[in-house]
Amino acid sequence: MVKVKLINYTPKPLETVTWAALISYWDGWSTEAFEKISPNDVEIHLPRILSYGHESILEHATFTFSIEGCSRVCTHQLVRHRIASYTQQSQRYIKINPEDVEETFVIPESIKKDSELLKEWKELLKRSLELYEKSIERGIHQEDARFILPQSVKTKIVVTMNLRELKHFFGLRLCERAQWEIREVAWKMLEEIAKRKELKPIIEWAKLGPRCIQLGYCPERELMPPGCLKRTRERWKNLLEKY
C-alpha cells in the first residue's frame, strides 16, 4: 500500500499568504506586520481575497510530501505537474529486491481478482527480477540492468509543491477519471493537509479538491462516470468531517 506523509511546509502558511496578499491593499503593510497577523486576520481576509480569484498569493506557501510504494506508472504521471520539485529513488544506485514480487511491484486489484491471470503476472514479474539479477551478476551495471524492469516497480519520491499548484493538482487527480493509483496518492496528500488543524481551513477557502468542488459542476460532461459527482463530493465532505 502506498504511504504518503506531509513532511514539511511553510511555517504559518495561512498567515504568510494573508500577509503577502495585504501588501496590495493595506497602507500599513510592512515586513514587521507579519508578526501581527492573527488567525482572526486570516479568517477575515483570506476567504474574501480568494473569492475574487486572486490565487497567486497561494504560491507563497509550499508543502513537501514523501510518497513510498507507488509504481513508476504513478510517478510518471506525477512529474507532469511541472511547477513542482521532485527527487526520486534512483535505480542506478538502489538495487531492486529480487526476492519478493509483491514487495517489489505494484499489482492492480483488477489483476488480483483473476487468479489465473495473477499467476501469469507473478511469473513474468519474477522472470524480470531473475534477468535483472543475472545481468548484474554478469557484470552489467544497474543503470543498464534496470531496463528489464517493468513500470510497475515500486519507487519512492519526495514532492514539493506550492499551494496554488497543489490546488491544480488536486483538481485533476482527485477526479474519478484520474488513473486509480495517482488518484489515491492525491487523496492521501489532501488527507495529510486535513489532519493539521492550522491547515484544514484552507481546504474550504481555496477549494482544495477535485474540479467539481472547485467549479461547482463537473467539467467532464458526457465523460463523467455515472454517480461520480455525488460520490466525489461525499468523499471530500467526509474527509473534512473526519478531522
Swiss-Prot record:
DUMP binds at residues 77-80, 88-92, 146, 173. One of its GO terms (molecular function) is thymidylate synthase activity. The active site is at 173 (involved in ionization of n3 of dump, leading to its activation). Residues 2-207 form the ThyX domain. Gene3D superfamilies: 3.30.1360.170. Catalyzes the reductive methylation of 2'-deoxyuridine-5'-monophosphate (dUMP) to 2'-deoxythymidine-5'-monophosphate (dTMP) while utilizing 5,10-methylenetetrahydrofolate (mTHF) as the methyl donor, and NADPH and FADH(2) as the reductant. This is Flavin-dependent thymidylate synthase. It comes from Pyrococcus horikoshii (strain ATCC 700860 / DSM 12428 / JCM 9974 / NBRC 100139 / OT-3).
